[in-house]
């Protein structure tokens, strides 16, 4: 006898911020005996190796933003092509439900599912609803949110909103109970600097100049791990080599980033939703530099969720100068109690079983079809 096992189509853009929580949900669904397929865009190749999907469908996608009318028009044409690809994939896969994690790459498959009357669930990772999710919210059965307070949810959709938290990937859960490292007077000071899955040039410009301004005794204790874009890597490494640091490691990408976060006394980073949620899960204090220029200022809102409880400092990029960063580092490293208190505060902001909560919601929705 053939036993029917439902399939859920998970839709996520090909960057870590969207893909990591989608991956966590996929593992939780598979634990429930639910099959998973992934719809994403062409950027996924470098980071989708561990995604537990029986099939990965690449959908044409583009973002219709910017001042160029031609570029926006071209993006709309690409999204239309992606819609055709997505509609064929949804018909072929016949999913019991489709889950979208935001970003324009999710629009074609989510919209195709809605038009084909397949139930859809949105997950909004940020503290401000993105434009793609806002567009899709009207047709979604459920809107799950990563943060308790989320701005921009359409008024007519608020009754369908459920706070699940942001799904935490297994690699983070594996180190989530790591105690905060000792910070006695002679212990190494472990600083981790990164800018999201694609790096951030501002970190390579500001952080080395700030480290140069630290007192020599702090520099001698400092063990620095920093993500740098490939084009910035050599210059960044060369600047640090002359500073007399206790240790330095720089690379374009760290596959073992959760473990490095757990080893750190302090993290300097952007404030994407995954970064903020993982800092809370592991319980590490941070200096957060929200990505500027976003129309909805989602990273600033994300950072505020930790800053408001004393778990992080949020510094706008316009104020993120070598002098400001050096002053904050000296203040924190010379007053270890501030760091330990911030670490404890961060822990209060996390929902460790968010993936299971979201999986239960998806399974319930799929079973109702």
Curated annotation (Swiss-Prot):
- Primary location group: membrane
Q: Which organism is it from?
A: Methylorubrum extorquens (strain PA1)
Pathway given in the UniProt record: Cell wall biogenesis; peptidoglycan biosynthesis
According to its UniProt record, which protein family does this protein belong to?
Belongs to the glycosyltransferase 28 family. MurG subfamily.
Q: Name one GO cellular component term.
A: plasma membrane
Q: Name one GO biological process term.
A: cell division
Q: Which gene encodes it?
A: murG
Q: What class of enzyme is it?
A: transferase
Q: Where in the cell is it found?
A: Cell inner membrane
Q: What does the UniProt keyword field contain?
A: Cell cycle, Cell division, Cell inner membrane, Cell membrane, Cell shape, Cell wall biogenesis/degradation, Glycosyltransferase, Membrane, Peptidoglycan synthesis, Transferase
CDD domains named in the record: GT28_MurG
Q: What is this protein called?
A: UDP-N-acetylglucosamine--N-acetylmuramyl-(pentapeptide) pyrophosphoryl-undecaprenol N-acetylglucosamine transferase
Q: Which reaction does it catalyse?
A: di-trans,octa-cis-undecaprenyl diphospho-N-acetyl-alpha-D-muramoyl-L-alanyl-D-glutamyl-meso-2,6-diaminopimeloyl-D-alanyl-D-alanine + UDP-N-acetyl-alpha-D-glucosamine = di-trans,octa-cis-undecaprenyl diphospho-[N-acetyl-alpha-D-glucosaminyl-(1->4)]-N-acetyl-alpha-D-muramoyl-L-alanyl-D-glutamyl-meso-2,6-diaminopimeloyl-D-alanyl-D-alanine + UDP + H(+)
Q: What InterPro entries does the record point to?
A: GlcNAc_MurG (IPR006009), Glyco_trans_28_C (IPR007235), GlycoTrans_28_N (IPR004276)
EC id = 2.4.1.227
Instruction: Note the Pfam families from the entry.
Output: Glyco_tran_28_C (PF04101), Glyco_transf_28 (PF03033)
Which membrane topology describes this protein? Peripheral membrane protein
Q: What positions does the entry give for UDP-N-acetyl-alpha-D-glucosamine binding?
A: 15-17, 126, 169, 197, 299
Q: Which residues cross the membrane?
A: none
The record's section on HAMAP family has: MurG
